[in-house]
Design a protein with these regions (language model features):
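Short acidic/glycine-rich loops and adjacent helix/strand connectors
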Residues: 1-234
Length: 234
């Protein structure tokens, strides 16, 4: 993508604006990580989670001494944000716009990991390690090579067709929303506990699309060892 960006800024933008100065490329997740600049912390652990930026879907590290040190990145196609968007599309909502509806809908579903069958089915195709790193069985996803979200194989796993926007929302749909919320919370909690252990920071700044999941954000202080959390305003 970088050569295309460079070509665009040199050709189109410069002709329109007559700008002759330098054009700097800022990494997507490093831009998200800039949330520390408006936080009250001098040192903090940093987590950015979203769909994808360049090739990174999740990145974490530490802000200290006026610099960022990234500790780990997870790359496309393995993405919690794209998983959430896939289920958003499956439930009949618009992608990149209505994920918040799925988050809200999850509260009406079965949030018990032991008894939510759709959580257990999604767990079969998503491997979450103890440090929070994750890998998807891409046989169940098509977003990495097609301009669509739910695959037929995923529909079969969830035992139903993609919901039409005007179709009634059933308890099954609510339980599926709860399942993807549970998966997301589980992965992010493991990442944060590993991040706290690695950085020894008591404060956390979190950003990115998944970082706007307010249902989970309210649980961070309860479920992790962090004592302070700063959320990047949208």
């Amino acid at each position: 993508a970088m050569p295309k960006v460079d070509a665009y800024t040199k050709a189109a933008d410069r002709k329109k604006t007559k700008y002759k100065g330098d054009v700097l490329f800022v990494d997507h997740h490093m831009a998200h990580a800039s949330s520390f600049l408006i936080s009250p912390y001098k040192k903090a652990a940093i987590l950015t989670v979203d769909g994808v930026g360049e090739w990174t879907t999740t990145a974490y590290g530490v802000w200290e001494n006026r610099s960022i040190k990234l500790l780990k990145e997870i790359h496309f196609p393995h993405s919690l944000g794209l998983l959430y968007s896939t289920i958003t599309a499956y439930l009949g909502f618009s992608v990149n716009n209505s994920e918040y509806k799925v988050m809200g809908l999850s509260a009406y579903g079965n949030m018990d990991r032991k008894t939510n069958q759709y959580y257990n089915r999604l767990k079969e195709i998503i491997d979450i390690k103890e440090d929070g790193s994750f890998r998807f069985n891409m046989d169940y996803f098509v977003y990495h090579y097609l301009d669509k979200m739910p695959s037929k194989k995923l529909c079969d796993l969830l035992e139903g067709k993609i919901r039409k926007p005007d179709e009634e929302l059933t308890q099954r749909h609510k339980d599926i929303a709860a399942a993807v919320q549970l998966i997301t919370e589980e992965a992010v909690t493991k990442i944060l506990n590993h991040l706290h252990k690695s950085t020894k920071c008591d404060n956390l700044v979190i950003s990115g699309g998944v970082g706007l999941n307010s249902v989970y954000n309210g649980k961070i202080l309860r479920n992790t060892h962090f004592k302070g959390v700063w959320l990047q305003p949208d």
